[in-house]
Design a protein with these regions (language model features):
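The feature captures the short pre-catalytic strand/loop hairpin that immediately precedes
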Residues: 161-173, 234-248, 313
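Active/ligand-binding-proximal structured segments within catalytic/core domains
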Residues: 90
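Catalytic nucleophile serine of serine hydrolases
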Residues: 84-85, 181-184
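Second-shell loop/turn segments in exported
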Residues: 22-23, 79-81, 116-120, 149-154, ...
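Catalytic loop of the DD-peptidase/beta-lactamase superfamily, centered on the K-T-G motif
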Residues: 21-62, 195-200, 204-208, 212, ...
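N-terminal leader/targeting segments and the immediately adjacent pre-domain N-terminus
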Residues: 1-80, 96-104, 111, 129-140, ...
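Active-site helix/loop module of the DD-peptidase/beta-lactamase fold
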Residues: 30, 70, 81-85, 97-144, ...
Length: 469
């Protein structure tokens, strides 16, 4: 299938970024120019909205369209699928339920499932609610043998019974808590068991515990007719409209839709600009639970995991953030506690893996890190069958992402965990590039000419990935 899951959306590359000399927050004009470049020049989106909040207030900058040929303007009330940013809401539910005494972080997940479901364990260690929130459960990104009836809406037919059957028969590859590995299944399962504990469904729980308390009227799984009229149409990397995603069973992993204004309201509460009874739960949610989840080279950002949030620390400062993606959308939400600035970036296009999807815009506004460079010109060559086969395999790009290089009908493809499959074009026997993105891959060829590792080059960054056994 073309899309396994855009719900996995952590940045692929985390090598050392460069910072601009001017650390002033960009003006509306400067932000609009960035969006115009992404839409008009790079053709990486159809319509984007950026929201910024700080002590001076909030502002919305938009560019592009709801759909190709749709004259209606984008604004702060335009609806987008926010994908994995939903996991932040799910983990806030967890923190709030801990505050209320309804659950504990160390509770085994099995406590909140039917007796007929056999949760996997290993060496006497059970998966806990904390393990699910911090992606150290040992559960895979999503169910192995995940075969949707409709690849364009891949989670629509994934049922609770299928999830229960998978869990009951799954063997953990490692002890729970041992290693960070991003898991949509884990995020969705967390939302499921919290809703079971509360005696309701996930959407109702989010509305009762979070959105109604914060006045977020435009954040929901199921859109009202009025909200649906404001929904930006999602697009694929070729800027063609795609279906919206329905995620009934794994709703806690990525089912929410929202707007820039609503997400800025959420960040206002995180930053202390909006009084809320969720204050203590939000503070608890940002406590780092595991440091340096993606070890990298000198000067590279440190990535830590909190409850649902990713905490990025580098020379530009600390940013608490998450991003998201579904079949036709890419999103970013984050805040800088030191400067008390929050940023939301929403795009109604899911570009090819490797293309700038909006994260760099968010970090640029929050810390002054430089924006991604536009794709460069390449020259294609033809490789013989043996040369292509030597490059195929699975490479450990980062703990939460494997890059699979496959050969199908004589053509090479790459697919990072949770991303679209994309064609790889050769410009030398050991160097491939993505057509629609500023990303290249260099392979190290071992004995016999078989690739032993690769390096992904993107936005001036180089990240090595060894071949997996």
């Amino acid at each position: 299938m073309k899309i396994t899951s855009g719900l996995v959306a952590l940045s692929l590359l985390v090598a050392a970024p460069a910072w601009s000399q001017n650390r002033t927050t960009p003006s509306d004009t400067q932000i609009r120019a960035i969006l115009a470049d992404r839409i008009d020049t790079r053709k990486q989106s159809v319509g984007m909205v950026v929201g910024v909040i700080d002590a001076k207030g909030r502002r919305i900058v938009s560019y592009g369209a709801l759909n190709q040929g749709d004259p209606r303007p984008l604004d702060g009330d335009t609806e987008y699928e926010i994908g994995s940013i939903t996991k932040v809401f799910t983990s806030l539910l967890l923190a709030d339920m801990v505050e209320r005494g309804e659950v504990s972080l160390g509770d085994p997940v099995s406590k909140y499932l039917p007796p007929s479901v056999k949760m996997p364990s290993r060496n006497g260690k059970e998966i806990t609610l904390l393990d699910l929130s911090t992606h150290v459960s040992g559960l895979p990104v999503e169910q192995e043998s995940f075969k949707p009836a409709d690849p364009a809406n891949p989670f629509a037919d994934y049922t609770v019974d299928r999830m229960y059957a998978f869990l009951s028969g799954y063997t953990l590859p490692r002890d729970p808590g041992e290693k960070f590995e991003y898991s949509n299944l884990g995020g969705g399962l967390l939302g499921h068991v919290l809703a079971r504990r509360a005696g309701t469904d996930y959407e109702t729980l989010v509305r009762r515990r979070i959105t109604s308390r914060l006045g977020m009227k435009d954040t929901a799984v199921t859109l009202t007719p009025a909200m649906a009229k404001r929904l930006a149409v999602g697009h694929d990397a070729g800027l063609k409209p795609v279906k919206n995603w329905d995620i009934p069973t794994l709703a806690g992993a990525g089912a929410l839709r929202s707007t820039a204004n609503d997400l800025l309201t959420f960040l206002a509460a995180e930053l202390g600009f909006k009084a809320t009874a969720l204050k203590d739960a939000m503070a608890e949610q940002t406590v780092v639970r595991r440091a340096n989840i993606m070890p990298s080279g000198p000067g590279a950002p440190e990535l830590d995991i909190a409850l649902g949030w990713i905490v990025r620390k580098d020379a530009g400062g600390t940013v608490i953030w998450h991003n998201g993606g579904t079949g036709g959308y890419r999103t970013f939400a984050g805040f800088n506690p030191a400067t008390r600035t929050g940023v939301v970036v929403l795009s109604n296009t899911n570009p090819d893996a490797g293309a700038a999807a909006g994260d760099d815009i968010g970090f640029h506004i929050l810390t002054g890190s430089k924006l991604s460079e536009p794709p460069q010109a390449h020259h294609e060559i033809v490789l013989d069958q043996a040369a292509k086969e030597a490059l195929t395999g699975r490479y450990q790009l980062r703990p939460d992402s494997i890059l699979a290089v496959t050969l199908e009908d004589g053509k090479l493809f790459g697919q990072a965990t949770g991303q679209e499959k994309f064609p790889l074009i050769a410009e030398s026997p050991n160097r491939l590039y993505l057509k629609a993105a500023d990303a290249e891959i260099t392979f190290t060829l071992g004995p016999g000419g078989r690739a032993s590792s690769l390096v992904v080059h993107q936005n001036g960054r180089d990240v090595p990935a060894p071949r997996m056994p």
